[in-house]
Structures are given as structure tokens and as C-alpha cells.
Amino acid sequence: PSMDVGINEITGRFGIDLNPINVMDENEVDWLRALVWPERQDESEILECAVTKAKEHKDEIKLFKGEMLDVLPKIFSDLVTSTNVCVFDSHVMNQIPNEDRQTLSNMLKNLSSQINIFHVSVGGQSNPPEIRLSRYCEGRRYSELLGYSDAHGRWSRWVI
């Protein structure tokens, strides 16, 4: 099927993390800052912009603490079936066991019997990391390679 479904209004933003960072807590933000390599000044600037944006929009984003495979069904159960859902991950899938990635794909297939799901994944196990769009519709998955990305987000090369 066509990947073109028009542009929809964003009705909710959700995040899942084993240990979500509270951007209102400077100690937690300092921990994030410590992860940026000292010679990567541009990445420090991007992080500061991201923290500022997260603070500005803190009430618009619902963060869940836990395992992705445990939390996603709960989030989906609260959504209206006429909603299109976009699941986005960036450089996470390479840290998840193969069987959990397959479980996620099967879960999204099953959930797509009630709701259209778009999964944009950056990273994974390819080198260079792929940017991939998977559309889940009526229990089936359709996948398309969009491009490649640097592991630190310094560049993207589109193939579409």
C-alpha cells in the first residue's frame, strides 16, 4: 500500500525510557552533559537546545519509565482508533536483543489491526546506520529504506 496518508495533527507525545531524565533537575541534565565527548562542542550546543525545548514543552510530553515491550501496549490501549501512530527510535535497536526486536515487530503488526502505525527507526545494526520507515497496517508490515545516518547524528544521506 501507499505510504502516503496525508498530514495529521499531532495529538500526543510519549517517551519510554528505562531511566527518563527530568530536564527540570540540573543534576540529571549534568549527567546528560557528561555523556557528550569534550571535543564535540557542536553536540553540546545541540544538547543545550534540546534541553531548552524539552523544558518549554514538558507538559506536552508524557514520559513512561520501563521496558518498551511492557509500556507500548498500555500507551496504545489509551489511543483513539482513528489516530495514526508514529513510533520513533534513534540508535536504540542495536542495544536490544534480536528476539525483542522481533517481538516489537510482531506487537506492532498485531496492534495495527486496530490502528495505523508508522515506525521510523534510525540506527539498528547496519553500518552505516539505516534510517528506515516501516508501516504497519491491518496486521502487515511494509518497510522502506529512507537513508543512512552517522551514529552521532552528524550527517544523513537520503536514498529516496
Indicate where each model-derived feature is located:
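A short acidic, Gly/Pro-enriched loop at the edge of an enzyme's catalytic core
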Residues: 73-86
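Class I S-adenosyl-L-methionine-dependent methyltransferase module
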Residues: 1-65, 78-80
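SAM/dcSAM-binding transferase cores
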Residues: 137-160
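Conserved SAM/SAH-binding loop
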Residues: 66-71
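C-terminal substrate-binding/active-site "lid" region of AdoMet-derived donor-dependent transferases
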Residues: 96-145
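C-terminal His-loop and adjacent cap/lid subdomain of alpha/beta-hydrolase
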Residues: 7-9, 59-61, 65, 95, ...
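A short SAM/SAH-binding and catalytic strip from SAM-dependent methyltransferases
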Residues: 85-98
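Short coil/turn segments at beta-strand junctions that form active-site/ligand-binding loops
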Residues: 59-60, 82-85, 115
